[in-house]
Amino acid sequence: MSPKSPASPKNPTPTRRLTTAQALVAFLARQYTERDGRRQRLISATWGIFGHGNVAGIGQALVEAGHGGNGAAHRMPYLQGRNEQAMVHAAVGYARQSGRLSAQAVTTSIGPGATNLVTGAALATINRLPVLLLPGDTFATRPADPVLQQLEVPYAGDVSVNDCLRPVSRYFDRITRPEALIPAALQAMRVLADPAETGAVTLALPQDVQAEAYDWPEEFFAERDWHIRRPAPDTYELESAVRAIRSARRPLIVAGGGVRHSAAEETLAAFTAATRIPVASTQAGKGALRHDHPADVGGIGHTGTATADELARTADLVIGVGTRFSDFTTASGTLFADPAVRFLHLNITAFDAHKLAALPLVADARAGLEALTAALAGRGYRVDPAYETEYTGAKEAWEERVEASFATPDPTARPTQTQVLGLLDDLVTEEDILINAAGSLPGDLHKLWRTRSRDQYHVEYGYSCMGYEIPAAIGVLLATGARSREHRPVWALVGDGTYLMNPTEIVTAVQENLPLKLLILQNHGYASIGGLSASVGAERFGTAYRHRDADGGFTGPPLPVDLAANAASLGLRVLRAATVDDLRKVLSEARDAEGPTCVYVETETPDTVSGPPPAQAWWDVPVAETASRPAAVKAREEYDRQVAARRRHL
């Protein structure tokens, strides 16, 4: 005899019958973040490319969310992408521009659609930027095994290609039952909204579970606010930090991306006004102070300014604020050369705060700087005026180097890359935003660009991913209200190598009529790696876009590839420039354009015209220890000389 079913409670919990996918979309549309009294949607939209692994689940749910009678506040806007990796980049660009207060979701099918997410997920997690990934997955019930696009793993039946996303996600879950979505979705939101934990979050969604119906408790769909905290520093750590600063004679601040994520720019300016400590910046931190702020000494490290790097070599206290201290920042452990140098690191993530054996100050960047400013105020700390005079003079000298790099003595000549940047520098205001990630441009921008506002400089150098620029610009445009008349000019700067990696989202910009401003610098190859190749004895092998010559090398004529025509074929209005004067005119025209526009220019190569200032600090790229070619032998000698200066800070 079967047991009796339990009696229903007198007041049963209200439920709503939806598929798992419908429930997830409805849940996401009701999640909000709050910080400093500002409230916004946590997931503002969903990017997608549909295949058999998500079209009947998430795809149908998005139709319901957009057209099922929901109020406008609870609809889920849909954005159509052309490449899964690019969709993640667009979402990351959106999240960065939104100050990590709002993010976007990305849905894909199973198989190649899912694995295409991996690069974008790595970029998001490395840069501590939130994105929600919703890849389709194989059947949880396994009615047929294998299904289309399934990877078979003989030793583990529960593994799919989505498991590639585990190491690049801050949170990963596979929803094998509808009811499992409830705790998983809440954990996913927690991580996305956590300033110390955030990054890529993956919820893998088996095809059958997406379409399976369940009676969901109504509470699951209530509006929910996720408070983004600003943790204050521990009293002991704060006192230790104050003692370290007060005893320093030559302190230097290294501002990282955490300053921007915390919206701590004004607080940093107030701290430097009180202490007169100079501020160098990483790629992610550039713009923490305006370029003309008295304490701003520019970029630091391998791509930094002579001013910042010389200060770093003699600093007795390095104060990191929201930085990861990557090898580009530390010049692979050779930059901070004072034998007695100490490190103090203000970071919301304890993992980063303890790097380089630093005194940790685990706190929100703004809260930590406010506490330091207050603690030092009553103790009369300020750097020696001679030190202030020293770095101010060095900054003025570097500005002369910038002017020389930007100078255009011959307006009829083909421009160099730095002259292109100089012409753009003449044109832009604090409203403009520049986006770049890879090639030789990040180095030139870090050394030379005059940042005018906190968010003007958008260079992704955590993963330095070729192909980030165009989709990220779309995300930035969406975050800045590109469909309004008050939109900000957003420039995506790419070389030909980067353009060829990922031009597909041009079509998305055209479809959405976003006023993207794409600047293509054609130099017929991988110029950045070509230069590195020459410096390490590899003789620029395989870095030029040229026909093969008789002996099989790529030293023939340039390839007859017309990137401007390609951009036009994808829907962009294209403006070509052959000379400095041409470029000045078309850049201005592009800035005023209301639709998506491309500026195309061939640049003079470093072989024929002097380029930007050389690297002011080393970067460790190991050179062949034994070789027969003279270039490699010479490069190894230089490598051995440089590596001798490398040290571990303990």
Specify the residue positions occupied by each region the protein language model found:
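Conserved short loop/turn motifs at secondary-structure junctions
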Residues: 47-48, 256-260, 408, 412, ...
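Conserved structured core elements
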Residues: 22, 40, 262-265, 269, ...
